[in-house]
């Protein structure tokens, strides 16, 4: 398994006093992927996409928003798994916390708010 999903840019430079960072979420494989975006700090960070489907070589915009707060070592985790149907509902696939299937995994993005 390689890098199935990545973000461009791969880092999130948001100030501790708040802000917005826009990224491209890219599917690098030849499979349809369902995804779930999780944050280690839901008090300060939110995203425009929580669940979704990335078609083969698809790109979606992920907008990360930070509320003002103390800077700390936070991260976003993009869990993913292969699906056969691009119209599948991705939410139930992540109900157990671990994405199912042979082609599954996660991409971790470090969130480093600067003062």
UniProtKB/Swiss-Prot annotation:
In Pfam terms, one family for this protein is Motile_Sperm
InterPro entries attached here? Ig-like_fold, MSP_dom, PapD-like_sf, Sperm-specific_class_P
Name the source's superkingdom.
Eukaryota
All copies of domain MSP, residue ranges: 1-115
For this entry, the protein name equals: Uncharacterized protein ZK1307.3
């Amino acid at each position: 398994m390689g890098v199935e999903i990545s973000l461009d840019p791969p880092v999130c430079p948001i100030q501790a006093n708040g802000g917005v960072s826009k990224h491209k979420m890219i599917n690098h494989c030849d499979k349809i992927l369902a995804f779930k975006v999780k944050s280690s700090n839901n008090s300060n960070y939110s995203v425009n996409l929580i669940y979704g489907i990335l078609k083969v070589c698809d790109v979606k915009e992920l907008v990360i928003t930070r509320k003002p707060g103390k800077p700390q070592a936070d991260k976003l985790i993009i869990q993913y798994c292969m699906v056969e149907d691009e119209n599948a509902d991705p939410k139930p696939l992540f109900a157990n916390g671990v994405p199912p299937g042979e082609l599954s995994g996660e991409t971790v993005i470090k969130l480093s708010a600067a003062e």
